[in-house]
């Protein structure tokens, strides 16, 4: 599975117990979002405030995502439903 497929799988399988908000990091910018919709190769992110150009929605290709920051105060164990596990 390549990186783009991993990001797509993460967004497709985002659990209801974890708020659909965060900050997507691309090589060009950091994009805060409060919700999203997915497609085969793209994700549309919804901002709570417009950017400097007035845009509230941003469409990003999965292969352009470098990282995802999550502001959630949930304990790490809650993220196991996203496929994460403690090291052995």
Q: Where do the PLM segments sit?
A:
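N-terminal recruitment modules of adaptor/scaffold proteins
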Residues: 1-55
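Phosphoinositide-dependent membrane-docking surfaces
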Residues: 59-69
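Short acidic, Gly/Pro-enriched loop/turn segments at secondary-structure junctions
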Residues: 52, 69-84
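Intrinsic disorder/low-complexity detector
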Residues: 1-6, 79-88
């Amino acid at each position: 599975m390549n990186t783009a497929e991993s990001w797509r799988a993460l967004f497709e399988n985002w659990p209801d117990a974890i708020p659909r908000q965060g900050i997507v990091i691309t090589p060009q910018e950091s994009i805060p979002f409060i919700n999203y919709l997915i497609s085969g190769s793209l994700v549309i992110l919804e901002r709570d405030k417009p950017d400097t150009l007035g845009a509230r929605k941003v469409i990003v290709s999965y292969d352009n995502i470098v990282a995802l920051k999550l502001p959630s105060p949930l304990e790490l164990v809650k993220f196991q439903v996203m496929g994460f596990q403690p090291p052995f």
